[in-house]
Amino acid sequence: MKKFILLAVLFLFLAIPTVPSTAVGIGVSREPLGAFKITAYHGSQVKGRKQAVTASGKIAAAGRTIAVDPRVIPMGTVVEIEGIGTRIAEDTGKDIKGKWIDLYATSLHEARKFGVKRKQVYIVKGG
């Protein structure tokens, strides 16, 4: 019986919202950076290589890697892009300046198909 009461109290405690409304999970919050221009690129655009080695030394991966202006978003920063998801700033580009993010895409075709979008961007903190 004591275990049941303890579990019930724990459940009620966890059910009470205690994190800010901008939170993406327990102990994780988002810091808004504003609207960014969002484009996409692929490794075949990078000096004819099949694998793109990022400015951080990692192999670029679709669904993870973004190129950023490191003066705006520091390398290694996790960001959430509205309607796209969470990505990591692992690359830069000579033309990527200011509020512009370039997503690494699965293919050159997908990168071109993505086009240019404008999305809200948040730095993900904590976790």
Predicted regions and their residues:
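Solvent-exposed, well-ordered loop and adjacent helix/strand elements within mature globular domains
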Residues: 2-4, 19-127
